[in-house]
Amino acid sequence: MIEPNEDLKRLIRTIPNHPLPGVQFRDITTLLGDSYGLGECVRRLADRLRDVGGHKVAGIEARGFIIGGAVAAALGLGFVPVRKRGKLPFETVGRDYELEYGTDRVEIHVDAMRPGEKVILIDDLIA
């Protein structure tokens, strides 16, 4: 029996010890470079999220922009880019977070979302 999404999983490259020893980095550039893989990834995510009732989709820099923007378009929703500290040109709000290998901060424009909006967050991974 084939596991769900096994076809997509096979398109993702694993790079051991990146960016640090002991970390298994899942490189989705191979999935993104495959027209079937990218299309199916977006279609399947959109199908699963269609009934969630989100108002917007947010994608975390940088690969979250690719998948998140495509999913937002497929769902007919607006897209909110979540950027690393200091990258957005307008006034921002942000949040610090921890990684396996350090800390960082992400920010959005202060007017990117309204109070009470339900936002679907997409990234390529969660460390």
Model regions: which residues?
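PRPP-associated nucleotide enzymes
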Residues: 1-127
